[in-house]
């Protein structure tokens, strides 16, 4: 038997073992107190659970830079029979991560997709106004939302919802914009953020609170593999073709830009890698502005 067969066998064994782990119900770990007037990072999650999957950078902004992370539940899923339960699961997951939670409207926004944007401008405009109001109320330093080719219709719809809502802000409004990926990989990420083993375990644990979803499909157990593949992709997509890959175990890929003067602008040339050993303030100093 080669060592690689043993390696793959152990991976399969661990995933099988993970299917027996408890789902949710874990006590939140202790965290530093976030100042009441701390700068805010808003995660605009197309579905309950996205905050746990793409939240590696948000978790580090909370811990290393003292930002208050607020998860905005753009929708609560399309299954109306599950929406109340999904809100309860989301509340528990955010509580575990130390994220605040904000609703858009009772039950979440509906029909967040490009078809609605094109065919029902009145409905779309009302949804955009909900998001625009939240941006104005929270005045975030940083916002997270999916990139424009993230495959899932609600993810792509959320991208356009945010861009349209940003366009409704006052001319002086500015914030860092972090585009995320999950269903569809970005062709041009420019930031790879390492997560420590502890952080990955916390995100997996939080994801397990979404009991109804992971019982149906235990995708929470595959998050580490996804984050390992991000290291492979990011080594060249962010670091440059043919370049040396960073010595990361797990990472998340993002596209970092800034909204200012009514448009999105890149904030640095090329790609950046943020190791777990380097404080996020050294890479994203503007993200911590008051």
Regions found by a protein language model. Name each.
Residues 1-173, 185-186, 205-209, 261, ...:
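Active-site beta-strand->loop->alpha-helix modules in alpha/beta enzyme cores, enriched
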Residues 58, 107, 160, 179, ...:
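Flexible domain-boundary/linker segments
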Residues 245-268:
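Acidic, Ser/Thr-rich low-complexity intrinsically disordered segments
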């Amino acid at each position: 038997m080669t060592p690689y067969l043993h390696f793959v066998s152990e991976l399969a064994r661990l995933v099988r073992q993970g299917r027996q782990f408890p789902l949710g119900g874990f006590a939140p770990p202790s965290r530093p107190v976030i100042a009441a007037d701390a700068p805010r990072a808003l995660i605009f999650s197309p579905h309950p659970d996205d905050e746990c999957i793409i939240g590696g950078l948000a978790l580090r902004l909370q811990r290393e830079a003292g930002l208050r992370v607020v998860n905005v539940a753009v929708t609560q899923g399309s299954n109306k029979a599950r929406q109340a339960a999904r809100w309860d699961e989301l509340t528990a997951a955010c509580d575990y991560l130390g994220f605040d939670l904000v609703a858009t409207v009772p039950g979440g926004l509906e029909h967040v997709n490009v078809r609605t944007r094109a065919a029902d401008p009145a409905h779309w405009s009302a949804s955009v106004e909900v998001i625009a109001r939240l941006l104005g109320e929270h005045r975030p330093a940083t916002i997270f939302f999916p990139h424009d080719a993230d495959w899932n219709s609600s993810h792509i719809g959320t991208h356009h919802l945010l861009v349209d809502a940003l366009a409704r802000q006052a001319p002086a409004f500015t914030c860092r914009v972090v585009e995320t990926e999950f269903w569809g990989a970005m062709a041009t990420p420019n930031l790879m953020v390492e997560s420590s083993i502890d952080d990955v375990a916390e995100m997996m644990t939080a994801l397990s609170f979404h009991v109804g979803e992971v019982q149906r499909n235990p995708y929470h157990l595959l998050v580490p593999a996804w984050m390992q593949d991000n290291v492979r992709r990011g080594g060249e997509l962010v670091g440059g073709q043919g370049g040396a890959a960073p010595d990361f175990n797990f990472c998340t890929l993002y596209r970092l830009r800034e909204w200012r003067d009514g448009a999105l602008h890149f904030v640095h040339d090329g790609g950046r890698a943020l190791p777990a050993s380097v404080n996020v303030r050294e890479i994203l100093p503007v993200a911590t502005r008051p």
